């Protein structure tokens, strides 16, 4: 049976209603975006895309799907097309979505049905996150039926907000089917230039929603929906007419079958011309062939979908395999899928077999431990087995859950991973017992009464790195497994409703349960970071004080602290909660608010804040005439100032208003800090805020408080999903304090390799405490995309083993961390420019990327630090686009230059104060601010780079540090597999000890992609 993408359907029956999760064809090549003739005006017909030769990009395979309750291709299905001419990139997509759901406004398009498109214009992002030029935009229908295009991240080309330059059309194309068409001007994708470049990094998501809530998505690659990881994008390559080819895919209508079921096998074939085609289907059970059938179909340009219904007979074992060999004019392909015969009973038997194997291995492990063998590393596999079996066995007792999320194939896959894990662990233990493997004992200093010194956590005199999961109640039930996994930390939370549900009500059962859990955790040597976030607003408080629901702010608090009742609620919560838990010595930190921000004055302004601002401006300027001169406005008086309007039209006013917001936000944060210290004196405090908001132009202002001053108020710098640049920034702003990421997200797509690589890069760039979201066995689209820790056994094992490595090498890692604030090269961090120069954040990010591969650490230097003379060891200060500076900054820059400092800025840079008045001059060396230009400058100045790498193309990150008379250096290759020959003081290094493996290595060696290696060279 055949259904072409044009919509003609010839199906013998229907098989919608079941979730699908089948093995699929791997797609790893480029997509070829063919040229087309202008003009392309969009008739609203897929036939037009076919006529122009567009190749299909099928989002049809299992790896493309992040919709837990997907019910087959007749539920949600999407095929994308791209074309180009000299002026536009054309985007087309045919989408079937059985139950549409839309958002009221364009900024939330990703929460409804519609597309997100992400671009790495120069295909140059090699570090986690987005770099300066990366772009993310979206298309979709709004609730009122209109079509909208929106930019969430504009890179160097676009402002955040609605996209007027994109021509968009959305046309009904059949039952539950829409054709999306968009013309994106190439100028919107700068610095990509189709006249000079032929490829760019790209990802596309189709988001599907139900009842206004994001259900999940189909994507080409990971890297947008879960976390922003542009280095995972694949390439779109510009091609001429008729050049290149597309890829085929296969899927099934559900994840598992029973005897007698009908199965619907869908083939997505990249046909390019009309003609007759055939598919030869073969069904096998093991080596035995049980069915063979040949199906003819009519091939069309732009792709053809072949639907083949197969009536399953009796199923035995794990099921059947379908092999499909398709042939059509000009092409052929071979695909396969499994018709799985799974049942809870069968998987319970498999679980029992894994459990018995794990029990036998535990006995072996205990015997080896008693004999003095260091078993920390193979023990991680056993811990993963225990915890995975625990939660999956629970799942197997819940038929509705198994059906809703199509869990049986996923559970089967996890059990296979457990067996493979145990196999490796058994071999590793045998090697340790025989002496064939070198033991790597892991120190276990007590996780209680930790102190902070020189930017690091200490247990006594030992530096410690803290790593573990964030969850709710489940971590307290799994303390033994957490410890055996290699973790030394965990985190949990209580909300306001659980402590003070109303002004006259107090509940302490949750607090006492936390206290009991902490005492139990101490037995397993686990530290605890307590998220005491006073959110959401309890209904009892809102009923008593309805004003608390007005002017929402404070991140997850959801209520402005200008409300006296909100402050009273926070005080009451912590007054009752903290005395119950504060005396536990393994309570090492309090996280004050989940994803805190000071967002008062972003979209609306509280009357108290407005009055304070007007009074502050009157005090600052004295007369409205003086204020108007700075702002370039014609305001009548201070009492009529409207910040919400004026900040949109006056750069000088925006600077004054955002500076005022910063001061007010600091007062808010001091209130939170002082309240917590009142009830838990001596416990270190931090506050979690989303990291991207610090240095991102579209997300920066809502936080409202500068990271530097925020870090000075708390005991260490807290964040959520920090990237390498943010971590360098934090360590620079508060050099003597640790940095934490207390909500790092992982998805079901996170591989073991990525898990290890991300942890190492974060710690080496200054992170001392890291928590993974989330330790829970629950299911939702959000958790599968961003909190799937207990659903990826192999990756969880990799995290546990990496945690052991980090704990073992904590002194060496801390040595690298301390090199960041001692760096000789710094980037100027200018809050004034962050407020007033739209292109500054992107240029700052680009300069950081250019500096990241020159074999020396990079720090940030703030305007405040400059003015205070706190320049550390900085010899070179780079000013990338910070054109508006405080007047005292200009004076400090002149002083820095007078002390032999070098200031680098782009040619033609002109500096003014925040209001546009020219600043006194200071010596500047003009530079292109590229890696090559920086490298030449550093050689000229003789900067300290004792160990140099040899990998070309800016793909190597290398840092060095001296410790105890030895030279340490680490290397991370962000490019293809290359031969690596390091140089020490200009001479090739012959050999070194690789500290993670403990092995002696000889150079040159082959350096894999994103595998961290730490070397020690002794004198």
List PLM regions with ranges.
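Mature N-terminal, pre-catalytic/accessory segment of carbohydrate-active enzymes
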Residues: 19-34, 240-495, 500-505, 574, ...
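Extended substrate-binding grooves/exosites of carbohydrate-active enzymes
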Residues: 455-456, 466-473, 490, 512-513, ...
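Structural preference for beta-rich elements and adjacent junctions enriched in aromatics
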Residues: 20-282, 286, 323, 329-332
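Short, acidic/polar
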Residues: 471-484, 571-576, 696-709, 751-759, ...
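The substrate-binding groove and active-site-proximal loops of carbohydrate-active enzymes
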Residues: 463-472, 493-511, 552-571, 596-600, ...
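Aromatic-lined substrate-binding rim segments of carbohydrate-active enzymes
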Residues: 476-552, 672-679
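Carbohydrate-binding surfaces of carbohydrate-active enzymes
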Residues: 257, 266-268, 330, 393-445, ...
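Polysaccharide-binding and catalytic clefts of secreted carbohydrate-active enzymes
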Residues: 553-716, 720
């Amino acid at each position: 049976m055949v259904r072409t993408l044009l919509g003609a359907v010839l199906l013998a029956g229907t098989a919608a209603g079941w979730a699908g999760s089948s093995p699929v064809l791997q797609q790893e090549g480029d997509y070829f975006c063919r040229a087309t003739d202008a003009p392309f005006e969009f008739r609203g017909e897929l036939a037009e895309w076919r006529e122009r030769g567009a190749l299909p990009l099928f989002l049809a395979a299992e790896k493309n799907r992040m919709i837990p309750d997907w019910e087959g291709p007749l539920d949600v299905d999407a095929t994308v097309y791209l074309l180009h001419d000299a002026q536009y990139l054309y985007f087309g997509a045919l989408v079937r979505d059985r139950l549409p759901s839309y958002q009221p406004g364009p900024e939330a398009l990703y929460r409804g049905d519609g597309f997100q498109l992400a671009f790495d214009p120069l295909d140059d992002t090699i570090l986690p996150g987005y770099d300066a030029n990366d772009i993310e935009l979206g298309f979709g229908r709004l609730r009122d039926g209109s079509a909208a295009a929106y930019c969430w991240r504009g890179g160097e080309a676009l402002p955040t907000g609605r996209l007027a330059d994109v021509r968009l059309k959305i046309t009904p194309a059949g039952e539950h089917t829409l054709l999306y068409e968009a013309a994106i001007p190439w100028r919107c994708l700068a610095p990509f230039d189709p006249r000079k470049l032929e490829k760019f990094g790209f990802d596309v998501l189709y988001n599907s929603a139900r009842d206004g809530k994001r259900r999940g998505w189909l994507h080409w690659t990971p890297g947008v929906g879960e976390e922003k990881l542009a280095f995972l994008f694949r390439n779109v390559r510009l091609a001429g007419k008729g050049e290149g080819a597309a890829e085929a895919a296969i899927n099934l209508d559900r994840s598992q079958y029973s005897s007698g079921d009908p199965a619907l096998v869908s083939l997505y074939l990249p046909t390019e011309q009309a003609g007759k085609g055939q598919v030869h289907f073969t069904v096998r059970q093991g080596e035995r062939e049980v069915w063979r059938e040949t199906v003819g179909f009519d091939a069309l340009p732009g792709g053809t979908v072949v639907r083949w219904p197969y009536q399953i007979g009796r199923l035995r074992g794990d099921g059947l395999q379908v092999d499909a060999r398709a042939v059509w004019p000009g092409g052929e392909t071979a695909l396969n899928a499994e018709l799985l015969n799974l049942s809870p009973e069968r998987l319970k038997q498999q679980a029992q077999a894994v459990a018995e194997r794990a029990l036998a291995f535990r006995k072996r492990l205990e015997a080896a431990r008693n004999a003095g063998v260091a078993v920390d590393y193979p023990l991680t596999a056993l811990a993963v087995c225990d915890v995975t079996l625990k939660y999956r066995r629970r799942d197997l007792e819940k038929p509705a859950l198994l059906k809703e999320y199509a869990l049986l194939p996923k559970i089967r896959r996890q059990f296979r991973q457990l067996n493979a894990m145990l196999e490796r662990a058994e071999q590793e233990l045998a090697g340790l017992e025989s002496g064939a493997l070198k033991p790597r004992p892991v120190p276990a200093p007590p996780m209680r009464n930790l102190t902070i010194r020189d930017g690091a956590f200490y247990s006594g005199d030992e530096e410690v790195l803290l790593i573990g999961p964030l969850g709710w109640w489940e971590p307290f039930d799994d303390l033994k497994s957490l410890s055996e996994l290699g973790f030394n930390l965990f985190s949990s939370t209580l909300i306001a409703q659980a402590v003070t549900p109303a002004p006259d009500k107090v509940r302490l059962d949750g607090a006492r349960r936390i206290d009991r859990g902490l005492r139990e955790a101490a037995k397993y040597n686990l530290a605890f970071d307590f998220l005491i976030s006073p959110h959401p607003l309890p209904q009892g408080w809102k009923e008593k004080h309805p004003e608390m629901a007005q002017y929402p702010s404070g991140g997850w608090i959801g209520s402005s602290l200008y409300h006296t009742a909100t402050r009273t609620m926070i005080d009451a919560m912590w007054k009752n909660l903290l005395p119950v838990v504060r005396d536990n010595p393994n309570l090492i930190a309090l996280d004050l608010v989940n994803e805190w921000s000071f967002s008062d004055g972003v979209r609306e302004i509280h009357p108290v804040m407005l009055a304070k601002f007007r009074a502050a401006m009157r005090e600052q300027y004295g007369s409205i005439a003086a204020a108007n001169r700075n702002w370039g406005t014609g305001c009548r008086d201070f009492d009529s100032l409207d910040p919400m309007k004026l900040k949109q039209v006056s750069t000088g006013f925006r600077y004054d208003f955002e500076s005022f917001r910063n001061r007010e936000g600091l007062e808010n944060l001091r209130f939170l800090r002082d309240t917590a210290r009142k009830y838990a004196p001596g416990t270190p405090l931090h506050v979690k805020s989303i990291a991207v908001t610090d240095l991102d132009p579209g997300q920066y202002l809502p936080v409202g408080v500068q990271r530097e001053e925020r870090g000075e108020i708390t005991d260490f710098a807290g964040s959520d999903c920090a990237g390498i640049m943010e971590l360098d920034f934090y360590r620079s702003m508060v050099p003597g304090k640790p940095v934490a990421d207390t909500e790092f997200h992982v998805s079901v797509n996170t591989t073991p390799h990525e898990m290890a690589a991300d942890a190492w890069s974060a710690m080496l760039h200054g992170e001392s405490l890291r928590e993974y979201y989330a330790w829970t066995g629950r299911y939702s689209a959000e958790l599968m995309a961003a909190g799937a820790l207990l659903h990826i056994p192999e990756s969880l094992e990799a995290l546990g083993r990496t945690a052991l490595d980090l704990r073992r090498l904590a002194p060496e890692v801390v040595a690298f961390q301390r090199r960041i604030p001692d760096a000789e090269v710094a980037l100027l961090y200018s809050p004034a420019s962050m407020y007033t120069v739209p292109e500054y954040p992107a240029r700052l990010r680009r300069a950081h990327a250019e500096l990241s591969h020159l074999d020396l650490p990079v720090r940030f230097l703030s305007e405040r630090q400059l003015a205070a003379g706190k320049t550390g060891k900085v010899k070179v200060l780079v000013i990338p686009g910070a054109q508006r500076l405080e007047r005292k900054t200009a004076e400090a820059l002149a002083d820095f230059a007078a002390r032999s400092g070098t200031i680098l800025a782009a040619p033609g840079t002109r500096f003014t104060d925040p209001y546009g008045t020219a600043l006194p001059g200071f010596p500047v060396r003009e530079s292109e601010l590229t890696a090559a230009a920086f490298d030449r400058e550093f050689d000229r100045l003789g900067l300290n780079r004792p160990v140099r790498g040899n990998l070309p193309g800016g793909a190597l990150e290398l840092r060095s540090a001296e410790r105890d008379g030895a030279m340490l250096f680490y290397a991370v290759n962000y490019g293809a597999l290359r031969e690596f020959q390091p140089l020490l003081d200009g001479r090739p290094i012959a050999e070194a000890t690789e500290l993670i493996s403990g092995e002696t290595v000889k150079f040159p060696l082959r350096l894999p992609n994103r595998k961290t290696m730490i070397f020690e060279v002794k004198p």
